[in-house]
Swiss-Prot record:
Gene name linked to the record: hjc
Assembly notes: Homodimer. Interacts with PCNA subunit PCNA1.
Lineage, top ranks: Archaea, Thermoproteota, Thermoprotei, Sulfolobales, Sulfolobaceae
SUPFAM superfamilies per UniProt: Restriction endonuclease-like (SSF52980)
Activity regulation as described: Autoinhibits at very high concentrations, possibly because of extreme junction distortion. Inhibition (and activity at low concentrations of enzyme) is stimulated by dsDNA and Sso7d. Activity stimulated by PCNA subunit PCNA1.
Cofactor note: Binds 1 Mg(2+) ion per subunit.
Organism (species): Saccharolobus solfataricus (strain ATCC 35092 / DSM 1617 / JCM 11322 / P2)
Record-listed Mg(2+) binding positions: E12, D42, E55
Listed name of the protein: Crossover junction endodeoxyribonuclease Hjc
EC number: 3.1.21.10
PANTHER family per record: HOLLIDAY JUNCTION RESOLVASE HJC
GO biological process, any: DNA recombination
Length: 143
């Protein structure tokens, strides 16, 4: 495994560990570079029936754009549809880790997806709060 893949794997393992510490059931399922034919997101996390799916991408420069190839994006979007999960692009840049809802990504003319540096994302704590807000129950849920 080259240094770039090792660094990306380390970031994914760190996210998995942090989500697990927050009470999620988490699976790391990296498929890039494998012979796998069915695209799946890098991280699948579940908590009380709420599913979040994270496709991780990283860049060395803070201002660079992050691209997801059309074929890969279509596959993980279909996975999200089938699972009922919320799909996020996890973006790791120097000093930055954010999670962008996939629907906020821009499409290029060739159908690829791109995250510009201006797109707002959630930090890990905000992502956890988003999930916890979905699972919080009020008395109305039981009436």
């Amino acid at each position: 495994m080259n240094a770039k893949k090792r660094k990306g794997s380390a970031v994914e393992r760190n996210i998995v560990s942090r989500l697990r510490d927050k009470g999620f059931a988490v699976v790391r399922a990296p498929a890039s570079g494998s012979k796998r034919k069915d695209p799946i997101p890098d991280i699948i996390a579940l908590k009380n029936g709420v599913i979040i799916l994270i496709e991780m991408k990283s860049r060395k420069d803070i201002e660079g754009k992050i691209y997801v190839r059309r074929e890969q994006a279509e596959g993980i979007i279909e996975f999200a549809r089938k699972s009922g999960g919320s799909l996020f692009l996890g973006v790791k840049k120097p000093g930055v880790l954010k999670f962008i809802p996939f629907e906020k990504l821009r499409r290029t003319e060739t159908g690829n997806y791109v995250a510009d540096s201006e797109i707002e994302g959630l930090d890990l704590e905000d992502l956890v709060r988003l999930v916890e807000a979905k699972i919080s129950r009020t008395l109305d849920n039981f009436l």
